[in-house]
Each structure stands twice: as structure tokens, then as C-alpha cells.
Amino acid sequence: MEIRLAEKHKLIEVLYVIRECSRQLLEKGIKYWNNSLADYNDISEDIANQFVYLLVIDRVTIGTVTIKPDKSNPKTLVISRLAIYPPYQKRGLAPQVLSFAEDLARKNGSTILKGTTPIEDKSLGQLLEENGFINQGSENEAPDEFISIKFEKRIV
């Protein structure tokens, strides 16, 4: 698998992967992503700012992740929208993406990686914990159906 920066013309591929993962989450009863116009605009802006990465196998986009600086702490990178197209899940790709994010953090002089998971998505929380992230508890400012758990990993 190769991880590379997304280019503007790949926006539809990013949205497609996220939509398919969103459908999968909804089937599990997890309401988290919705592919709204706001998502379209946010992702388009993140691509322009070089924060969106594609996971590619044999020139086919099979996943995406957004890794960008935290607005409140420039020494922190935030991982979001980690999505792997369902047929490619459970193949050990997500830990590779987390390792990539950690390497990127080191290159950028960041000392913390952080992200959130929906409170109901136990498997993603477990994946983060298995890869050295520490559960920081829930965020209370979100509506009940969007309560999420914060995770952090110190970069050394």
C-alpha cells in the first residue's frame, strides 16, 4: 500500500470511500459521518491545504485519512476521517496509516497525535489503544448521538 497526498481531482474518490464507510457504520447503528455539503467543502479545503491522504493499492484508492495541525496547539496533529473501503478492512492497513501519521508528526516536530471515535465504535477505539493511543474520555459538547471518545498519543 502507498500513502500519498490527495489531489483536487481525487475529491470524489475520497467522498466515495467515506460514504461507503458511513453506510457500514450506519448498519452498525453508529451515526457519525453523513457526507453533507459541509463535508464536501471541508474535505475540498483540506485537500487544498495538503492535509488529506489517499491509501492506494495498484493505482486504486482504497482509503483516506486527514492529518492536520490542531488549531489550538501547533505541536499537535489531529487524525480524522480515517476510512478504508470495506472490502480492504481487516488487512492490517489501519495500523500502517497510524504509523504513517506518527512519522509525519515526527517530521513536523509535533509531540502529540490525537483523534476521536464515536462512542459506539468499540473496534476503532481498540485499534487506537493497540497502537499506543490513550483514551482521554468523552467529549461532552456534542449532541447525544455524536458523543465521541478522545484519544491521544505522545510522540517521542
Give a label for each model feature:
Residues K8-L11, Y16-P87, L98-F100, L104, ...:
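Acetyl-CoA-dependent GNAT
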Residues Y40, K122-G125:
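Short, surface-exposed alpha-helical segments at coil->helix boundaries
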Residues P95:
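Residues forming the Rossmann-fold NAD(P)(H) cofactor-binding site
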Residues G92, G109, G132:
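Short glycine-rich hinge loops at helix-strand junctions in the catalytic core
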Residues Y85-P87, R91, E120:
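Active-site acidic-Proline motif in GNAT/NAT acetyltransferases
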Residues L98, A105-T117:
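Conserved GNAT acetyl-CoA-binding A-motif
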Residues T116-P118, G125, E129-I149:
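Conserved catalytic-core motifs of GNAT/GCN5-like acyltransferases
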